[in-house]
From Swiss-Prot:
Family annotation (PROSITE patterns): ISPD (PS01295)
Gene behind this protein: ispD
Site (Positions MEP for the nucleophilic attack): 152, 208
Native species: Clostridium beijerinckii (strain ATCC 51743 / NCIMB 8052) (Clostridium acetobutylicum)
EC number: 2.7.7.60
Keyword Transmembrane helix belongs to the record: no
HAMAP family xref list: IspD
Protein name listed in UniProt: 2-C-methyl-D-erythritol 4-phosphate cytidylyltransferase
């Protein structure tokens, strides 16, 4: 069984918006609608779990799932941090073989990216899409002076969905929970415990909508791509 966990817990602080970013309107529908639709329409995905803050569950059911006829398998309460939300969802997936973990604020994930996530997770147990940074990346010191310039061809900006053998990611999450280790994404979870992640070619259109500038780009994409 292949399962997808969609994380929709962003509060939209960088948007300057009181409304959670996954519910922001994008050409007549909330951002989360487009994200869920991509996974619902994918033939490789057997089960979908959506994670939202406890106090938004009723709103999400009413204004997203029911309003747009989106069928998922479970709606799970998120935690205070991203890794807690992932852990809560993993606990609902006892019989999965592969699990994909995706940001709800990435509505332009393609079917190709999802398919590759499943394929490479089966082959390598851990995989994620990534793109080369377009800008030169430097390391700076505490006084804001440059210290070093990194080799751009060796760098990659990791996207989602990040895909894993279920037992691997679940056991790794249990271990970092026990050790009280904080991480920013799920590839870091398995890497901290000695497992390599296969990185395949991502898509520059697979943006995470985080800032007002991202929303401008998203509005263009939804009118010209979706």
């Amino acid at each position: 069984m292949v399962s997808a966990i969609v994380l929709a817990g962003g509060r939209g602080k960088r948007m300057g918006n009181i409304q959670s970013k996954q519910y922001i309107d994008l050409n007549g529908a909330p951002i989360l609608y487009y994200t869920l639709k991509q996974f619902i329409e994918n033939d490789l995905i057997d089960k979908i779990i959506l994670v939202v803050p406890e106090d938004e569950k009723d709103y999400c059911k009413r204004e997203v799932l029911n309003k747009y006829g989106l069928k998922i398998d479970d709606l799970v309460s998120g935690g205070n941090e991203r890794q807690e939300s992932v852990y809560n969802a993993l606990e609902k997936l006892e019989k999965s073989d592969i699990v994909l973990i995706h940001d709800g604020a990435r509505p332009f994930v393609s079917q190709k990216i999802i398919n590759y996530a499943v394929e490479y997770a089966k082959r390598y147990k851990a995989a994620a899409p990534g793109v080369m940074p377009k800008d030169t990346i430097k390391i700076k010191d505490s006084n804001n002076f440059s210290v070093d310039t990194l080799v751009r061809s060796e760098l990659v900006a990791i996207q989602t969905p990040q895909a894993f053998d279920f037992n691997l990611i679940y056991e790794c999450h249990k271990e970092i929970k026990k050790r009280c280790i904080s991480v920013t994404d799920d590839t870091s979870v398995v890497e901290l415990l000695g497992h390599k992640v296969y990185i395949y070619e991502g898509d520059y259109k697979n943006i995470k909508i985080t800032t007002p500038e991202d929303l401008i780009l998203a509005e263009y994409f939804v009118k010209n791509i979706v």
